[in-house]
């Protein structure tokens, strides 16, 4: 798995016949030059087809490096692996265009990945849902539902990757009336990381320490919260197509004007405001869903953002100050024995398993697709 944060490739080995406990993991960071190219491909540019094809090859090589190294460390031959679920790197996500079927693009040369690993590769999971007029995202709520199936009470899961998405898992006692809900809430780490790198040279704000030194700029926060996406009802999905560095700078200019002499918040204050944006939009989504559905008893946070201590503290504080959400037990997936950075990679192992079995893996109540569909294509080794 390589997500919107574009920090690298997360590989995880999972025996889905014996529950969901991961056996091993390995991470390969993206080389800076590849990350630069992938970020540029999020917006139109010259010679895109050629650049995209070469980038897809490089992504496949990094995936293969992660898989082969993980298996070597475990002493496991490729023949032991039933399938490799590979997401690829999203560079465009436009699931609906003027009411017509849109597209979603995850760069990955799956044939090359198959060749380099000797393992069957399941990939391109989002396209089938988009073809069925769905959003193609988020796909993880269906996996979250399987992962937390043993919990009788209603569970909410926030996945803080580059983008934040919410999974709402009602109690199983509802039977046929039970409907899993999920949608993208807005930016999680994507803007925080971009601003941090731009102003400190660091790829991310470790533990939110830099943001914690700043003050929330409420006029800027109001400007950011006015983004129409936050007020759209689900099903909905988003990504770097909307929330990128250019969007943030446009919001700053709209709030403070183009004149550099106009007083602006410090870079640290902007970081604090972006952290508040993530916490607020996440909780706004949880609150709205609480009013539409059976109230959740637990709020589980996963993804890289769950490692941001300051952000987690702010999320908990906002919950405690909200009468509708004060009862929520807020925790990270690590407190449930599942590493926060492993959940999404595990989801694509599960999606690969569903593809090999020929079983449906989307949740139409989440994506808005016309019905349940078998997701992904398969390259045989």
Model-derived features with residue positions:
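Short glycine-aspartate micro-motif
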Residues: 1, 80-85, 155-159, 182
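Active-site metal-binding loops of divalent metal-dependent hydrolases
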Residues: 4, 89, 162, 304-306
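Short glycine/proline- and acidic residue-enriched helix-loop micro-motifs
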Residues: 40-55, 202-208, 261-264
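Short beta-strand-loop/turn "lid" adjacent to the catalytic site in phosphate-handling enzymes
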Residues: 45-108
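Phosphate-binding/catalytic loop of phosphoryl-transfer enzymes
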Residues: 96-104, 111-115, 119-203, 374
């Amino acid at each position: 798995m390589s997500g919107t944060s574009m920090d690298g490739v997360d590989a995880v080995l999972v025996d889905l016949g014996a529950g969901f406990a991961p056996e091993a993991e390995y991470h390969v960071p993206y080389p800076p030059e590849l990350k630069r190219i992938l970020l540029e491909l999020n917006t139109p540019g010259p010679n895109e087809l050629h650049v995209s094809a070469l980038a897809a090859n490089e992504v496949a090589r990094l995936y293969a490096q992660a898989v082969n190294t993980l298996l070597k460390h475990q002493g496991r031959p490729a023949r032991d692996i039933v399938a490799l679920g590979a997401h690829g790197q999203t560079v465009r996500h436009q699931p609906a265009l003027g009411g017509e079927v849109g597209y979603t693009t995850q760069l990955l040369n799956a044939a090359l990945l198959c060749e380099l690993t000797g393992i069957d590769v399941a990939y391109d999971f989002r396209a089938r849902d988009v073809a069925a007029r769905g959003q193609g995202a988020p796909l993880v709520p269906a996996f979250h539902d399987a992962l937390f199936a043993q919990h009788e009470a209603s569970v909410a899961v926030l996945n803080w990757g580059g983008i934040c998405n919410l999974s709402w898992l009602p109690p199983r006692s509802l039977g046929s009336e039970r409907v899993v809900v999920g949608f993208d809430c807005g930016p999680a780490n994507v803007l925080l990381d971009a601003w941090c790198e731009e102003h400190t040279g660091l790829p991310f704000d470790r533990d939110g320490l830099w943001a914690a030194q700043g003050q929330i700029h409420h006029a800027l926060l109001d400007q950011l919260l006015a983004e129409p996406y936050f007020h759209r009802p689900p099903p909905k999905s988003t990504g770097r197509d909307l929330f990128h560095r250019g969007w943030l700078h446009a919001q700053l200019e709209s709030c403070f004007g183009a004149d550099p002499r106009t007083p602006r918040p410090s870079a640290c204050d902007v970081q604090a405001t972006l952290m508040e944006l993530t916490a607020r939009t996440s909780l706004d989504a949880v609150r709205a869903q609480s009013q539409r559905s059976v109230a959740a008893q637990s709020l589980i946070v996963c993804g890289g953002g769950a490692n941001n201590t300051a952000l987690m503290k702010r999320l908990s504080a906002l919950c405690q100050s909200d009468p509708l959400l004060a009862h929520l037990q807020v925790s990270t997936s690590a407190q449930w024995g599942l590493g926060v950075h492993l959940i999404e990679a595990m989801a694509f192992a599960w999606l690969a398993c569903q593809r090999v079995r020929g079983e449906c893996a989307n949740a139409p109540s989440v994506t808005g697709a016309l019905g349940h569909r078998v997701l992904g294509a398969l390259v045989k080794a």
